[in-house]
Amino acid sequence: MRVPEKYSTLPAEDRSVHIVNICAIEDLGYLPSEGTLLNSLSVDPDAECKYGLYFRDGKRKVDYILVYHHKRASGSRTLARRGLQNDMVLGTRSVRQDQPLPGKGSPVDAGSPEVPMDYHEDDKRFRREEYEGNLLEAGLELENDEDTKIHGVGFVKIHAPWHVLCREAEFLKLKMPTKKVYHISETRGLLKTINSVLQKITDPIQPKVAEHRPQTTKRLSYPFSREKQHLFDLTDRDSFFDSKTRSTIVYEILKRTTCTKAKYSMGITSLLANGVYSAAYPLHDGDYEGDNVEFNDRKLLYEEWASYGVFYKYQPIDLVRKYFGEKVGLYFAWLGAYTQMLIPASIVGVIVFLYGCATVDENIPSMEMCDQRYNITMCPLCDKTCSYWKMSSACATARASHLFDNPATVFFSVFMALWAATFMEHWKRKQMRLNYRWDLTGFEEEEEAVKDHPRAEYEARVLEKSLRKESRNKETDKVKLTWRDRFPAYFTNLVSIIFMIAVTFAIVLGVIIYRISTAAALAMNSSPSVRSNIRVTVTATAVIINLVVIILLDEVYGCIARWLTKIEVPKTEKSFEERLTFKAFLLKFVNSYTPIFYVAFFKGRFVGRPGDYVYIFRSFRMEECAPGGCLMELCIQLSIIMLGKQLIQNNLFEIGIPKMKKFIRYLKLRRQSPSDREEYVKRKQRYEVDFNLEPFAGLTPEYMEMIIQFGFVTLFVASFPLAPLFALLNNIIEIRLDAKKFVTELRRPVAIRAKDIGIWYNILRGVGKLAVIINAFVISFTSDFIPRLVYLYMYSQNGTMHGFVNHTLSSFNVSDFQNGTAPNDPLDLGYEVQICRYKDYREPPWSEHKYDISKDFWAVLAARLAFVIVFQNLVMFMSDFVDWVIPDIPKDISQQIHKEKVLMVELFMREEQGKQQLLDTWMEKEKPRDVPCNNHSPTTHPEAGDGSPVPSYEYHGDAL
């Protein structure tokens, strides 16, 4: 091919824009009517105002960006350097080098310095050229820009012309709006009036977004087909495929396009993994702030969604979906629904807490513990260094325990179990509404072939396996990875997960030893104020240690889970995401909840008794619960871990890390020379600005934060009724934080179609079921609710709780202490102690079977187990009943979906009938005129208006 002379006389400043593999333009069959690659050479003088959103011609929109690093000779940007690189490219293409290609530099002069090329970089460049040539063959249009403000970084701009968009939309079965518009059935009667009133009331908190307004009409959507283009509204081809859809189509082509040299054969994913390209992303629509910024969807999202000043408004979910795609839109819709459902849970939780505050002075057990007249002397909390102590000194703890350990918490546990079931049903119904609005009904069947596209890593392993078989002269048909190929990875996964869980348990054990040793050390302190606050000090510091460890291990476990999933080599992206989610959730669940499980179910259970305590490593005596029980400590543990995790890990990191990165970039800029600094502050192209943003890492971390929080809200809600309130306050901030991160700090993600939240829904259901069981055990074994009921109905003399505290305490003769375990200062209270008390159901020292477990213990245990069984089955039944009563699909949505199907059938019936009539008319005109009129004549009807017979054609075919 010889390039026309008019394309080789470009000014030098325009030659940095070159088209890879331009030698194949004629061979590829590009026609001028379809927008040839050569059009990019006619530079629009106004194109610079587009700031990188369009090609140099100012007409073709940039749909995708590929970024690569290239080496420059001492950072220079000389034309000779570009000419040398261009000639090296041409040397691999069998193209005449005596005439420059469009946009290329002229051949290098003899005096130009020769630049040595690194073999590895040269190899990457060759692979880029081959890959970009294959993209050209796929119909995409490319434009290269290496003359950027970012040293050593080149950009490949990709544009998908109309015929490529149509072809790929048909292949992907994208549902596009047709010309047919129908009215959405409106509610009538009282329901319509209620909806109208609610709309007026909520109007101030609605976002000022066109997509958020109630729609009375809807366009009928149908999978795009080039044969049926007449059905679609193609009056404006530029806006028919929006930027989200265009980038999705280009990304699918990038994934399918292969690079056959050596092992790089799996498309853009493999090329990114091997460093051939350093990044690939679609562009944002433009800037989001500034006085002279052109209005765009990104700016609208920033003003109506991603600003803290609109925290009280509803989210413009339809606009979020339009800009980021269905998968991101579903995440924010789910987060909004979850936050909305937290409002009633928070209100009930606050009422339960206020009930505890109002009745604290009427609680007889705490009053007895605070009454110094009872003069109850308790046994030492540790060996030797700890002394005897008065129960009245734990008065504050007992009163605080009542705030969370009262009959209302049982009701709240039942309420939250039903709340979780209602939330799941509410989300399923909302999800169906979104599927209808976003034309995702029937999506799963249409996407079956596309979603099973193998991952690049899987294809690489299959290729490696097939090459091994070829070397052994074996059959290579239908090579795939079997369980034998994956067994080492599965074994590594199992061992690693068990090891990580063991590490978590070991850390919890270390914190337990810290608590025991610290309590003993503080007990030796001479200050009375220090000794009186031992429990609070030890609990608070231990929880803070747990919090720091949890935050650190969360990051470590996230990386380990991703590595373990990678070595499994899942076949599809969906399989990879599900396996990664399961591993990460398992490890982070164990990491977050193990300290809480210890306090709730193990602390104080294996202590032993005075004179026969249980020791760890024969040195550390197991911890005991406070006289009021471990529920208060569980509440402290929950609140600090939950609030600290949300404040530090979720919010502070998300705000602080981007600010820190900006500050580091500012410091680097100050170190640069004045000329480089002046060039840096110049306005960059859109693709240069987006390159400096953080890459999108998926939604798994976002979902994980909320699922762990959902666990805090539901699993131990019996001990912390304020958890929904703190979760609500956090989520109000979290929504805007995530929104601002997506709009301002992240590169625009590729829009991915999805009709649900995937495996996260099953995890939510599992957490909800587990919450019923855990709350049953917390109420039964951790709180004093069951012992109080047993005492009230079996042992109380007057039907009140008077004497309950004394009933739960056993007696111990101090002469039965083991050698070396008695207090060093037995007269610390000012008198000699002969009998001390400890919390347990055991026989007294004067009994025949002294210190054995008493009958009261077995009565309470039986009542506890009975309560667990009754509570679990009753709440499970009520949850399933709620699930059964509430239909998954709203009735109006079901009717609208049915209406769409009927309209679609009618549309195609009319189309087929019209085709048949046209065919019959054409056949009638083609009949020979010498044929008698009575042969093959149609049925006549004399009722025509003009008296002439009217032909009637019958259609017996199937319309669809």
Curated annotation (Swiss-Prot):
Q: What is the effect of changing C630A?
A: No effect of cysteine-modifying agent MTSET on ion permeability in contrast to wild-type where MTSET blocks current
Q: One Gene Ontology cellular component annotation?
A: plasma membrane
Effect on the protein of changing N591A = Increased permeability to chloride ions
**Extracellular compartment segments:** 355-406, 515-542, 603-631, 780-866
Any one of the GO BP annotations: glial cell projection elongation
Query: What does the annotation give as the result of altering L643A?
Result: Increased threshold for activation by calcium
Q: What name does the UniProt record give this protein?
A: Anoctamin-1
Organism encoding this protein: Mus musculus (Mouse)
Effect after changing G656 to A/P = No effect on threshold for activation by calcium
